Amino acid sequence: MSQNLNPVQPKVLLDGENISFESLVLEQSMNSCHRFEVVCEFMSQDEMWKQTPQKLLNRIGSRAVITFEHKDSGTPYEFSGWVTDVRIDAWESEPDYEFLNHRSNRVHIIGEGDVVKLNGSRGMDSFVDCQLKTIVSQATQPAGITVECDPAFNGVIPYVMRYQESVFEFLNRLSSTYNELFFYDGKTLIFGQPKKSPEVALTFDHDVFSLCTRASALPSSVAAYEYIHESDKQLCVEGAKDSGTGLLSNVKGCADRLYDDQELVHSSSSVTSDSDLKTLLDKKSKTLGGSMLSIEGQTRTCQVVLGGIVEVIFPSKMGVPSLGRYRVVEVVHKVDKSGNYSNHFVGTPANNEFITQRYSGSVKAYPEMAMVSSNSDPKSLGRVQVQFDWQKRAGKSTNWIRVQTPDAGGSGMTNRGMVFIPEEGDQVMVGFEYGDPNRPYVMGSVFSGSEGKGGGDGNNKRTILTKSGHQIVFDDDKGGSWGITIADSNGNTINLSSSQKTIVISSQENIVLQSKNITLEAEEKISQKSGKDFDVTVGNDYKLEVEKNSSSLVKGDSVESIEGDYSNNTQGKIDISVGDDYKCDISGKMKLSVNSDASFEFSGKLDSESSGDSTLNSKGKMYVKGSGDVYIGK
C-alpha cells in the first residue's frame, strides 16, 4: 500500500477565526447540501466547560470555510458553509474492562454547505412559460448564493410548481425531471453542465490504494407519450440508443441483449413539441446507460473533488489499460490535525453526457381549492387561469389550464358537450394529471357560503342558472309545481307542468314562430284570442276546412276585399240576414242561376234600375203580379 508522503494541510475558519481541531470529516455528494463535522478535543472537562456552553452553542450560524491543500504541491480546495449543529460531549465510554474507562471531552461542530440556505422551510411557488435557467435564477435569487446554470434542456416549460418542498428540494426534483447535473462544488451551485471540471490522473497503488469497479445490467430503452391539447396532437417518441464508449459500451451491449423490451410511460414533463420530448428522452436514455458502470476508490490526494474528473491508470509494468474517465459523484474527505488525509469517492462515466441521479425524492400533488382569475382564453379553447391561495401574496396565477366537464368532445369543426366555463372569482377544485404538480386542471366548481343555494324542501329542485339570471329548473315535487321551467331574466318563460299536463309559453313582448313549415294539431280544441288586432297574411293559397258548423261573429264593421274571382259553393241552404241596408256593387256582369224555383220577397219597396237595356227571358210563362196595379211604362 502506498505511503502518505505528501500530507494535507487543513484549515477551518469559523467567522474568520482559525479553529484548532482533532479531526475533520467532509461528506459531499451530488444533489445534496453536504455535511461537515469538526471535532475539537479538550484535555479535561474543566478546560472544555470553561469555554462555557453559551459560547460554544453560539457557534451555530457561524460562517465556516474549510481548506485542503497538500504541503508540497497541488491546488488548494476550498469549501464554504454554515454551522447548523453543536454538540458538547462529556461522555463516559463503556469499554470491555472497567479499569479502562475513558471520558471524552469533545465539541462537535457540524454544518452544511452554503446551499443549506435553500433547504429551509417548505413552501409553494409557480413559474409560467419559463426556461430552466429562468426558474433556477428566480428560485435562488433571495438566498444570495453563487449559481452557475447551463442546462441542456432549453425548451419553454408551460407551468412548473414548487410543491410543499424547500427551494433545494424543488431544484433537486427539477434536475431529476430534466436529467440535469445538480451539485454544490464547495463554492458554487451548479445546475446543468459545469463550465469547467477539475481533472486529475490517479495511479493505482500510488494515488489510489483501494479500488472497486461495479457494472450492472439495466434496461435503458425508453419511450414516452404526451398529449398537447393546444394543437390536439398526440405524441409518442423514442429516446436515442446510446451505446457509450470504453467499458460502458461492453456493459450496455450485454444489458441490451438481456433487456430487449422498451419502457413506455407518460412524459416526465409537459412539453410543447415533439422535439422537446425527444431531447428529454435522449437525456434519460444516456443517464440510464451511465448508471450501469461506476468505480469506487480511496485515495490520499485532496485533488479528488465533487464534480471533477478522475482517470484511473495503472503502472506501466502491469500492462493494464486505463479504466477511463469518471465524474466524481460522491466523495468523503477525512483528515486529522496532523494532516493525515484520505478520501473515499464514487465515480460514473464522464464520457456519458449525463450522470446517474442521486435524487430519490418524489412529489404527488393532491386536489386543492383555487379561484378563477381569468377566463379570457387568448386561443378560445375554453381554458381558465386560476389562483391558489398561496399565490395571492405574490400576485401569481397558473397558466391557461383545461376545465373538466361531464361531456366534451368534437363534432367536425366544432366542439361538442357541456360548455360551462367558470366565471372570474368562482371557486374551483383543481386536480393534477398523474399527481404531477406541473399539470393542473379544473375538476369542477364549488359554491361558497354566501352563494350556495340548495334544492329546497325535500331537495326536489335541480337548477341551471346563468350569471344574468337565465335558468332552467327541474322540479320533482309531485305535490307542488312538478315540472320544468325555462325562464330568462326578463320574465319570458316556458313552463312544462307535469302535474297539470300543460305547456305554457309566456313573453313580455313578442313570440315569433319561424320555420319553413309549421303544423298545429290538436285532438280536441284550438283556441286563439287576441286582446287587440289579429292579422293573417298568406303569401299564396289559403284553405280552411270545417267538417261541421262554422260561425263568425264580427261586432264591428267587416270588410272583405277580393282582387280575383270569388266562388261560394254550398251543398245546403244559404241564409243571409242583414239588420240594415244590403248593397251589392258589381262592376262587371252578374249571372244568377237557380236550378229550381226562385222567389224574391221584399217587405218594402223594390227598385230595379239599369243604365242599359234590361231583358227578362223565360222559357215558360212569366208572371208579374202586384197586390195593386201593375204599371209598365216607357
Regions found by a protein language model. Name each.
Residues M1-S62, T67, D114, A201-H206, ...:
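Juxtamembrane "anchor/assembly" segments of surface/extracellular structural proteins
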Residues R87-G111, K334-G347, K379-Q385, R439, ...:
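Short, solvent-exposed secondary-structure boundary/capping segments
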Residues V38, G111, R122-V147, R162-Y184, ...:
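Amphipathic, non-transmembrane alpha-helical segments in extracytoplasmic/periplasmic proteins
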Residues L306-S374, G454-G456:
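Acidic, low-complexity/disordered segments
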Residues V310, P367-E601, K605-E609, S614-T615:
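Structural signature for extended repeat/solenoid scaffolds and their inter-repeat hinge/linker regions
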Residues K50-V147, Y159-V160:
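Surface-exposed cap/loop segments at beta↔alpha junctions
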Residues R106, G113-V115, P151-L218, R439-M443:
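Short beta-strand-centered interaction patches in the first periplasmic/extracellular domains
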Residues D72-G81, K317-R327, G435-S445:
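Short, Lys/Arg- and Gly-enriched loop/turn segments at beta-strand edges
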